[in-house]
Amino acid sequence: MAPLPALVALLPGIPLTPPPALETAPLPSQRQPPGRPAALSRGQGDWLEINGWRQRARWRIEQGELWLPLEVLDGQLGVSRSPAGADGLELEWFGVRVLVPSAQQRSLDDEVPVPTTALLRARGVTISHRQGPLPLELPPAELLSIRSRDQGLGLRRVVLDLAAPALVRSGDGRLQLAIRSSPEQQRQLQTLGLEPSDTNGWLSLRVGDARRLSLASPWRLVLDLPLGETPNAAEPPRPQGDPRLQALQAQGLQLQRQILSSGGQQLLVNSVQLDPRQVPLELRTLNRPSGMQGLSSLNQLARQEQALIAINGGYFNRVNRLPLGAMREQGRWLSGPILNRGAIGWSAGELPQFDRLSLEESVEDSQQQRWPIASVNSGYVQKGLARYTADWGPRYQAITGTEMGVVVRGGSVQQRYELGELNDGVPLAAGDLLIVARGGANVPWQPGDRLSLRSRSSSPLGLKPHVMGGGPLLLQNGRVVLNGAAEGFTPGFLQQGAPRTVVGSDGRQLWLITLQGVNGPGPTLWETAQLLRQQGLVDALNLDGGSSTGLVVSNVQTVMGRGVAAAVHNGLGLVPRQPGP
């Protein structure tokens, strides 16, 4: 995730010319017709053509406004985004800023699209609506100069000075930039270890997990590269040639890729199968070590845990980047279950258990009065009390505009926060319990009051040291148990076809599965459940899907749900088991 401009400006090293005040592009309702290009005609589709590069991506035009998913803006155009107020967003691209309140966010199948016409046209992007893929065109910018310097703080900054704004695509550790560069400039980039290559007007650079920032006056693209992650290091072994995989396959690991039919369409099904009691791989949750807010690439999540194989995990809010479901690690709830949705729970070296899961929690005062807790370390907000711990991150900042709370340490209330005092954030130390009240609920306690926490899981799997939530639950004990309404999913979600990620079991082996449509959108949940039962599975849990669907094998993302390596919140990984003493 790109750093906020204010933070970047504080980093030492190459000075950044202080940018002028950001331009603010008007929202659709604020636009004035004089001088504007002709309104776009109504339509929708599944493909974009970005400076000639064809990319599968959902789009919609309504009332002259182009709506694009957040993943497309970030991964295919280079737009930065950050939270703004309660459920709002701020989009920023080469000095233009667009504020998008929650009312301006919509649903496009399983994507979150936002209005983009003003932002794109403010920087010269031509939008042409015609039959077939929707073209987005921005003339390639000239690369004027390259500057580089070690920053301290474990970063090296590379600044690309440009003659104009440029499109920026990202994925699998590389950036593709719509810029024109000279052979001498490419040699300079090679010296910096960025492995430049120029193809059809796109300059490709290997940047690893670099943070990026676009600026105006003058036009610049800033890359902060983590030191120690050398972009030009030897390429990771390809899956088919990785000796680690070959050794594990000899011990029973299976990797399959096949075309199957379901619901009248062909599906590309990738599966990983193993007996965790025999194959020396451990199933682990994958998450960001910095806390529960934020997204990462699946490849990055896998690498930091040294997972040889990984799939994307549970649901999250793409706007505020917070978790929406259960995730438990080493007996700690990093994020609690919601809506009695499906989950798996497991211990090392065993097959997971599958069930629907909820937590029943309450706090009790010295007079034995109890107050129910609605959620634990969750981005799913509702009226009532919620609790947060240091597993949420080093700080908690109010998610809604009306919150108050108390910090409990050692069973005693230490500090009270009135309405509004959580907006700027409060620290969370190890052992702290922050109880937050929302939606008019009250926290009646004062410093010194004694409180105790009571917690009970609705299913034995909630007592397992490791839990991953998703939903809906598809199969249990050999039966199709799909009941999306009981798990809080909408009818539209249940009926749509989409790429899928599933974790399952045939009673002997663990299965990690992705399903994609060959020439269609993908299977419905019912089609997924039926197909997996036909393949011999007895238990199966649907995880986050759509553009989130991904499979990483040996540091290579071999499956991308809609053709883009989308950022995700968490995942499931298979990590080589360490040999005993």
Spans of features found by a protein language model:
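Sec-dependent N-terminal signal peptides
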Residues: 1-11
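Gly/Ser/Thr/Pro-rich low-complexity, intrinsically disordered segments
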Residues: 10-56, 61, 65, 75-103, ...
